């Protein structure tokens, strides 16, 4: 288990020319620095409703860029890919978004697609650098769109999973 970085040490992390994250390429102190930037975004979402409104979108984008860690199982992969699809192609309707975990609850037959090597050019560092809540929301949406574009070869699968969510996710327990 990795050691968490303190909030004060996160403030000192900025995208630099050293220590690229092996998953997304962010230059912010390697994988630990990248995670620290993301963890700070999560903390900020608790204090600002505008940031909180796009937090799930940020989680899905980050998870898909760090699929080896956050999308190990077919269910976790499906949750994040379908979540991104829901947000970007189905308006991010809360009732649909929260139907995804209900759809994945229990025995669901899924085959995990191959993890992509190219997962987008924007990273958590681009969002972290946003000045103010409005810029943050805009950057999260751009980041998610960039990751979605990188997953173009799996978009039809995500849409099929969304159709399954819509067809059967609401009544499942």
Where are the model-predicted features located?
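Intrinsically disordered, low-complexity linkers and terminal regions
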Residues: 1-173
